[in-house]
Amino acid sequence: MKKKYRIKKNDDFQKVFRRGKSFANRQFVVYTLKQEGSNHFRIGLSVSKKIGNAVCRNRIKRYIRQSFHELEDQINPENEYIIIARKPAANMDFHEVKKSLIHVLKVGRVLKQKPNNSK
């Protein structure tokens, strides 16, 4: 995922927190805010120091970014997303992280239907 599709600035984070909707499961909280006219979604990641050391936090962020990259064609391109990892995410492998993100995005009705020709 390209860096221009990431949310980095505090003002952008606060805008999504204040105006957006939130959805959660045990591992992740997802805030989403619709941005009219955007041609690609943006994501911001937050992983607290309570979750683990830097290696653990960076691994979780890599897993989340890769999951969004693989789900790119199913995600609404007009939204901005903030993903906050919770403590149970520290012990998960990539496939568990992806499955959990799919679950929370379905709860929020953010994912489009899977194309029939996909694997």
UniProtKB/Swiss-Prot annotation:
GO terms for molecular function: 3'-tRNA processing endoribonuclease activity; ribonuclease P activity; tRNA binding. It holds the Pfam family Ribonuclease_P. Its EC number is 3.1.26.5. It is an enzyme of class 3 (hydrolase). Keywords: Endonuclease, Hydrolase, Nuclease, RNA-binding, tRNA processing. Gene3D superfamilies: 3.30.230.10. It comes from the Bacteria. The keyword rRNA-binding does not apply. InterPro entries: Ribosomal_Su5_D2-typ_SF, Ribsml_uS5_D2-typ_fold_subgr, RNase_P, RNase_P_CS. One of its GO terms (biological process) is tRNA 5'-leader removal. It catalyses: Endonucleolytic cleavage of RNA, removing 5'-extranucleotides from tRNA precursor. Consists of a catalytic RNA component (M1 or rnpB) and a protein subunit. RNaseP catalyzes the removal of the 5'-leader sequence from pre-tRNA to produce the mature 5'-terminus. It can also cleave other RNA substrates such as 4.5S RNA. The protein component plays an auxiliary but essential role in vivo by binding to the 5'-leader sequence and broadening the substrate specificity of the ribozyme. This is Ribonuclease P protein component.
